[in-house]
């Protein structure tokens, strides 16, 4: 066959459907789970959809992506929301991002935050440090660092924050003392607004419905319950746990590289580097109570709470109740046992460790030369949202067809 696609999440489904739209049908998708959607799957819990992968929404910012996705699930089946997300920090509830909304805090806290921002390293000309924790202090000031960024990132990723690089944060604008002061005086937000400032969510379903429909559009081209165990680069062959072998001219892998128990034909140094790719696992847990808030989600940096974020389901999922939490797998021991619905996502977030860019550049370049292309959050080991992943998959199909190799 021309294309073997590993994984029926947003990346794999988009790539496959885009091929079909281009008139190419010589492909197959293999998926470990019994349903499509990857991290964006939904299940029914307490009478309404529960997104087992956590908070996944369709950002409005990519019209080309939305047009493509609406061809499977029309726009009239979606609600459009203005993002309402807050951070609970030191008894204050402030809008996200924190640096633009310090004006919402108690006056005494505003003063302390302003003082720390004024002497942040980036504002007084101190050289930029390399260590992650030092960089956070340098970029945001001690108050934002100690009250929010450091404890939150420890909860979301792990305690060893200095294993992370700073390359993924360097595009963040400096926190301007002048803008923050004006914000506090005028009582309104300044600065750049976060991603998902507006987003879509299905009216009648969970986010997973979109991917189910995309899978239905290529029915007969997906094999489920197929867990990949090995790959042979010499023959471009994939081996699954049941012993079946699949061979293709080009393999598109959207699954974690760590999932290959056996890798044949890859240089030892590249193969060895895969073990240095890190990730965090996240458990989602459902609670049936309605919260007295209009927010869509809430961030909790407090280290005494096990979870780092709450998704308030009844505020974005029509005719639902309750909320769910997101908790790093290393912290679930803090929770009291209960009978709530829970789901553990082994592969939730790729970690942006210091050496990751070097590892992935070499890995992806070499493997592409062998006809195996990494795509999406796990194929590229990048913390992409679903809309970005869809965009990348669409572009990859265009690139491969334009190259003339796959007419």
Enumerate the language-model features and the residues they cover:
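Short loop/edge segments at beta-strand edges and connector loops
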Residues: 80-82, 222-226, 376
């Amino acid at each position: 066959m021309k294309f073997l696609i590993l994984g029926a999440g947003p990346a794999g489904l988009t790539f496959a459907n885009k091929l079909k739209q281009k008139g190419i049908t010589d492909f197959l998708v293999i998926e470990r789970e019994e349903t499509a959607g990857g991290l964006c799957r939904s299940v029914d819990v307490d009478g309404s959809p529960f997104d087992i992968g956590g908070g996944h929404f369709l950002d409005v910012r990519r019209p080309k992506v939305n047009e493509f996705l609406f061809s499977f699930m029309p726009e009239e089946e979606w609600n459009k929301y203005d993002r309402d997300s807050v951070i609970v920090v030191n008894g204050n509830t402030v809008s996200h991002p924190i640096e633009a909304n310090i004006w919402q805090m108690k006056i005494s806290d505003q003063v302390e935050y302003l003082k720390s921002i004024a002497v942040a390293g980036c504002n007084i000309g101190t050289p930029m440090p390399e260590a992650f924790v030092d960089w956070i202090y340098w970029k945001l000031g001690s108050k934002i660092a100690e009250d929010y960024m450091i404890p939150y990132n420890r909860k979301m990723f792990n305690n060893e924050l200095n294993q992370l690089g700073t390359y993924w944060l360097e595009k963040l604008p400096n926190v301007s003392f002048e803008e923050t002061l004006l914000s506090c005086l005028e009582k309104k937000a300044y600065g750049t607004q976060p991603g998902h400032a507006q987003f879509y969510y299905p009216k009648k379903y969970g986010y997973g419905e979109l991917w189910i429909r995309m899978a239905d559009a290529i029915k007969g081209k997906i094999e489920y319950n197929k867990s990949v165990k090995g790959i042979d680069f010499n023959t471009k062959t994939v081996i699954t746990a049941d012993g079946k072998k699949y061979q293709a001219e080009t393999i598109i892998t959207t699954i974690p590289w760590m999932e290959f128990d056996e890798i044949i034909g890859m240089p030892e140094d590249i193969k060895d580097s895969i073990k240095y790719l890190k990730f965090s696992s996240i458990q989602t847990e459902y609670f049936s109570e309605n919260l007295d808030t209009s927010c869509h989600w809430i961030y909790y940096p407090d280290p005494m709470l096990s979870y780092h974020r709450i998704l308030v389901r009844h505020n974005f999922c029509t005719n639902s109740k309750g909320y769910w939490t997101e908790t790093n797998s290393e912290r679930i021991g803090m929770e009291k046992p209960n009978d709530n619905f829970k789901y553990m996502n082994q592969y939730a977030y790729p970690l942006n460790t210091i050496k990751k860019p070097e590892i992935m550049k070499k890995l992806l370049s070499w493997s592409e030369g062998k006809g195996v292309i990494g795509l999406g959050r796990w194929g590229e080991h990048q913390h992409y949202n679903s809309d970005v992943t869809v965009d990348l998959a669409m572009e990859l199909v265009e690139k491969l067809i334009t190259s003339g190799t796959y007419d």
